[in-house]
A protein has these predicted regions:
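Adenine-nucleotide phosphate-binding core of ATP-dependent small-molecule kinases
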Residues: 1-32
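Active-site proximal loops enriched in glycine and acidic residues that flank catalytic Cys/His/Asp
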Residues: 4, 15, 40-45, 71, ...
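Short, glycine-/Ser/Thr-/acidic-enriched flexible segments
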Residues: 7, 46-47, 100, 110
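Flexible, glycine/charged-enriched surface loops at secondary-structure junctions
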Residues: 12, 29-37, 66-74
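Glycine-rich phosphate-binding loops at beta-strand->alpha-helix junctions
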Residues: 37-59
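Conserved phosphate-binding/catalytic loops in two-lobed NTP-binding clefts
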Residues: 54-100
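Structural signal for terminal/edge beta-strands and the immediately following C-terminal loop/tail
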Residues: 80-129
Length: 129
C-alpha cells in the first residue's frame, strides 16, 4: 500500500485489481443471497486501511450501503469493533479486529490439556469479556 501511495504503477494496479475483485465478490454474494445483513472488514488491511475499505465499497451504493467516511477513515484495529456505516445504510458495515495468534495458542493449550473438543464451543478467553 505504501508503494502504491508513493506512485509505484504496478502497486497501484495491484491495489486497483484487489479492490475490484473484492467488490465483484461482494456483489456476487449479495445477488446469490438476496439479502445481506452486514459486511465485515477484518485482518491487517481490513482493520487498518480505511481507504481500501472505501474503495472496495465504491459502486456498491446500489445495495444501499452508506459509509460514514470520517469514521471509516479514522478507524483502526486499536479502536475495537466499529460500525463504519451510517444509520441510513441498508447494510451494516463493520471493522472487527482479529487475533489469530491468540486463537492458535489457545487451541494448542486446549489440545494439550485435553479440554479442546470443538472450536465452535471452545471457551476462548476473548469470549469471556
Amino acid at each position: 500500500l505504501q508503494n502504491a501511495e508513493t506512485g509505484d504503477k504496478k502497486c497501484q494496479l495491484a491495489v486497483d485489481m484487489e479492490c475490484y475483485k473484492l467488490r465483484k465478490i461482494l456483489g456476487s454474494y449479495a445477488a446469490a443471497l438476496g439479502h445481506v445483513d452486514a459486511i465485515v472488514f477484518t485482518a491487517g488491511v481490513g482493520e487498518n486501511a480505511g481507504e481500501i475499505r472505501q474503495r472496495v465499497l465504491e459502486g456498491l451504493d446500489c445495495l444501499g450501503i452508506e459509509i460514514d467516511k470520517a469514521k471509516n477513515l479514522g478507524t483502526r484495529s486499536k479502536h475495537g469493533e466499529t460500525l463504519i456505516s451510517t444509520p441510513a445504510s441498508k447494510i451494516k458495515v463493520f471493522m472487527i479486529p482479529t487475533n489469530e495468534e491468540l486463537v492458535f495458542v489457545e487451541d494448542v493449550v486446549g489440545i494439550l490439556n485435553k479440554t479442546y473438543d470443538d472450536h465452535m464451543v471452545y471457551q476462548y478467553t476473548f469470549l469471556k469479556k
